[in-house]
């Protein structure tokens, strides 16, 4: 069957589930973590025709949040805070990934997209030799070679 990939902000992972499955719980029977311990909070996902999964990170991993968020309640509140608060908590550094590409066939990480210009990546779309990003607050799409 077909596989559906689901991003989980709270757990910083990507779940893989059978697309025909019904009533699944993250981490439950029939739902496996395809990619865990990600360097950011995953948002948009896209798969190209070559079988590469593109993961955009809505925010960078927050050491403060990971240290203090013992419950999903605090993590959920922080992830739903106002934009100014989120930028202070989750601001990407110049070397922090805003998106990554991973081969679904081999599980190998193929490319990392970094830089403050692509901070807070809300959408990702691979097209031929380019990857386009929709960044929060940007008036136009950003592009990178793949």
Where in this protein do the model-derived segments appear?
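Structural signal for beta-propeller blades
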Residues: 12-14, 61-63, 99, 139-142
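Beta-rich, blade/repeat-based domains predominating
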Residues: 1-3, 37-51, 96, 116-130, ...
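Blade-edge beta-strand/turn elements of extracellular beta-propeller
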Residues: 15-38, 106-115
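Conserved beta-strand positions in repeat-built beta-propeller and related beta-rich domains
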Residues: 1-11, 55-59, 89-94, 133-139
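Beta-propeller blade signature
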Residues: 89-106, 146
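Short, conserved, GDST-rich strand-edge loop motifs in beta-rich repeat architectures
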Residues: 58-94, 141-144
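Histidine- and/or cysteine-centered catalytic micro-motif in compact active-site loops
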Residues: 2, 9-11, 19-20, 37-41, ...
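Short acidic/glycine-rich loop or secondary-structure boundary segments that cap or lie
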Residues: 13-15, 25, 42-46, 54-56, ...
